[in-house]
Amino acid sequence: MDHSKQLIAVIAEPGPERNALAEAITCDGMWVFAADNISYLPAETALIVAHAHAVPHQHWSQLAGRLPTLVVSDSRQDADLIKAVDIGLVDYIVHPLRHAELLRRMIRKAIELHALASERDRDRARLAELNESLETHLALLRMDQQSGGHIQRRLLPARPKVINSVYFDYWFAPSLYLSGDFLDYQRYNERYSAFYFADVSGHGASSAFVTVLLKYLCNRWLNEWDGLQPERLAPDWLAAMNRELQGTDIGKHATLFVGVIDHCSHTLHYSLGAQLPMPLLVADGQLVRLEGEGMPVGLFPDIEYPSLSCALPAEFRLWLCSDGVLECLPGKTLDTRLKELEQLISESVTLEQLRDRLAQTNALLAEGDAIDEANPDRDALPDDLTIMMVSGFGHAD
């Protein structure tokens, strides 16, 4: 059999009319299989042309569900024709031998529509399968992200914490699960404590991996420090981290602030790489931006970072914020938002007060505590948001 031709089953009573009907169909280059019932039809049958009287009315629904079917009749008032049409068969034609060309066109069109419907059903089934697979992969990815976020939060220091009479606290709110923000503070000895505040470019898994590297390296470098020249520790860390990120070739850079507090001389030794917003120091009723500037860490090779220092009074509050905070503030320009942040900080004595004031400007921040774990019920923040506050010196360990 030529498989380029379609096989049409003609169901009608044997006789000259059935033969003529079959001949009219074969004129269009189609094969015809003639039968007087629907019991035995070839598997490759593409369409059925059935006479209204040749099929019992109780079999029309079975026929319609099996193959596309055209009904032919000798009269438009044929009761069997009406029953067949009510079942929902493809179409019908009266006096088919008088309208042989129309019959052939209807057959071709019905086969074409059936092929399109079958293709659509296959596409729908394939799409449902792909959607199910996608949902499964998304669920696994979500579980991985949640697990990664949990591990990342375990790497953060305990909060709040007092080190050598200086109070450290922070608010950590990832955009979704994993964050490109990170911070840490540690006691070196009775005289020195060190801390850092980082905002890795982007957010999500790749940025979070950089924070793990940062944690490992800073712990190692602090353990290797001999306790001499505290003013060199911060810029040396930034330069070393810059080389590490350059060497990884992962296309990530970071803004990074590193500070060393001398608890004997009440001095902050620090260095910074493209920190935005700038660290804000509140002391003696005044709010000032810490001086200094530096290039982003990991963006350019062979960068030297500044060695800076400032005196710390007996009572002070040092605030460090990631740039995600600016996304939560009103104002069309960066300067407007920075001034708004400075105003909120000047009015806040505790981290909770600043957070409450920020929540009044952004509804997402009011949807639950995001400090200890990401809140899966809230919408994603526009960016990772982290705030760190350092205050001293009068706190009891």
For the regions a language model picked out, list residue spans one by one.
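Conserved acidic residues
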Residues: 44-48, 90, 316, 323
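A short, well-structured beta->alpha microelement
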Residues: 22-44, 50-59
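Non-catalytic signal-transmission and effector/linker regions of two-component phosphorelay proteins
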Residues: 1-14
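Flexible nucleotide-interacting loop at or near the entrance of a catalytic core
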Residues: 113-133, 137
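CheY-like receiver
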Residues: 49, 60-122
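Short acidic/polar segment at the start of the alpha1 helix of CheY-like receiver
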Residues: 14-18, 210
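Catalytic cores and conserved motifs of cyclic dinucleotide signaling enzymes
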Residues: 160, 232, 236, 288, ...
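… and, occasionally, acidic/histidine-rich disordered N-termini of signaling adaptors
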Residues: 128-318, 368, 373-397
